[in-house]
Amino acid sequence: MASMSTVFPKPTSFISQPLTKSHKSDSVTTSISFPSNSKTRSLRTISVRAGLIEPDGGKLVDLVVPEPRRREKKHEAADLPRVRLTAIDLQWMHVLSEGWASPLRGFMRESEFLQTLHFNLLNLDDGSVVNMSVPIVLAIDDQQKALIGESKRVSLVDSDDNPIAILNDIEIYKHPKEERIARTWGTTAPGLPYVEEAITNAGDWLIGGDLEVLEPVKYNDGLDRFRLSPFELRKELEKRGADAVFAFQLRNPVHNGHALLMTDTRRRLLEMGYKNPILLLHPLGGFTKADDVPLSWRMKQHEKVLEDGVLDPETTVVSIFPSPMLYAGPTEVQWHAKARINAGANFYIVGRDPAGMGHPVEKRDLYDADHGKKVLSMAPGLERLNILPFRVAAYDKTQGKMAFFDPSRAQDFLFISGTKMRALAKNRENPPDGFMCPGGWKVLVDYYDSLTLTGNTKLPEKIPV
């Protein structure tokens, strides 16, 4: 069977607007119209040629030092002032180094930070703009700032004090934590997972500059073979002859409703005239909140789904997206979409309440469930990307399988929430037949069994540095 590092599919659904094929050549042009509430744009139409689209800025950024120069750069790094990276800092460095944030070339300087925070974009030298909705910044404290002094370069080191990167032509500026939190999350309520992990106790200064990463980032956790860079993904997609790439991000186990959505999306793309649409199944691999299923268990579950034939390995590429999860709703989902452009995707699948979470204080969702997909259809810098909102899938009791929800017979459908799914797995109970493949469900049960054995109700996964 095909290796899991080169295959996979997941949930999707399709827009109701017509998609049209150009008959002038073998290439396909999609035209998708989105209604907008903007007074200046009552309708938005996107046209994208078949195949892989250009990365933002026209060229993928690669910030890893070429191998012949690594020894020299390591010697340079040894003599520079040092900034120690946290696990989340390392994940952002990984993101930057491989070009997921192209054309960004390092941790943000103040002008880039302000453009991102206030406008959700970056202005390029040629007058064009690219989407950039979340700040990618590095915090330092007063002591680190003093040690850096007048130096224009610093060495970034891991938890063992080993140099792993150099930051050049640096700029140090104030870290406006409250404003950053308010503008990114839309609230400063206590209990935001990423804020508590990475911002609240971070330094009061930010340091930006051009990044040189001394070696490719490896986690040595048995999953590195799934961590394909944008360059590697594009190479794999071209090798497969993809004429359309539809990306789906997830941080949860795959059930048969997801598979239905994914296969339906591919069917619709084939009906449009595409000959070989490929799914990029792209689970998030960075920081997640404590009650999410850890990455290693999610990847085991995804593999079983593939082995059980729920997903087609020939038309799916499975890879890990190294970004941390912010749970910043419509703001963050723009980042998720933008990064997939750099990986070659021209279609992005978006579901209900993408990148959302429950309000940390009040008993409600933090974000409107429909705002994510609406924002993506209007966001500056994402015009080249076709947005595919989910169709709602639920368990059809009359058919004994996952199916698209039919409101005319709502009584026939059962919605199995993530909370319900976790409760069933924790209690070693089986879901209805047809909800999830048996192999995938067993992985989920085994995960919750492992928590019971350790005496924990939840065992957060340590992120290696």
Swiss-Prot record:
Gene3D superfamilies named among the record's database cross-references: HUPs, Sulfate adenylyltransferase
Enzyme Commission identifier(s): 2.7.7.4
Induction comment: Accumulates in roots during S starvation, but decreased after SO(4) anion restoration (at protein level). Repressed locally and systemically by phloem-translocated glutathione (GSH) (at protein level).
Transit peptide: 1-49
UniProt entry keywords in alphabetical sequence: ATP-binding, Chloroplast, Nucleotide-binding, Nucleotidyltransferase, Plastid, Transferase, Transit peptide
Cross-referenced InterPro entries: ATP-Sase_PUA-like_dom, PUA-like_sf, Rossmann-like_a/b/a_fold, Sulfurylase_cat_dom, Sulphate_adenylyltransferase
SUPFAM superfamilies assigned: Nucleotidylyl transferase (SSF52374), PUA domain-like (SSF88697)
Enzyme class: transferase
Pathway field: Sulfur metabolism; hydrogen sulfide biosynthesis; sulfite from sulfate: step 1/3
CC terms in the record's Gene Ontology section: chloroplast; chloroplast stroma
GO molecular function ontology, one term from the record: sulfate adenylyltransferase (ATP) activity
Positions of disulphide bridges: none
Any single biological process term in GO: hydrogen sulfide biosynthetic process
NCBIfam families noted in UniProt: sopT (TIGR00339)
Similarity-based family: Belongs to the sulfate adenylyltransferase family.
Assembly: Homotetramer.
Protein name per its UniProtKB record: ATP-sulfurylase 3, chloroplastic
Native source species: Arabidopsis thaliana
Gene name linked to the record: APS3
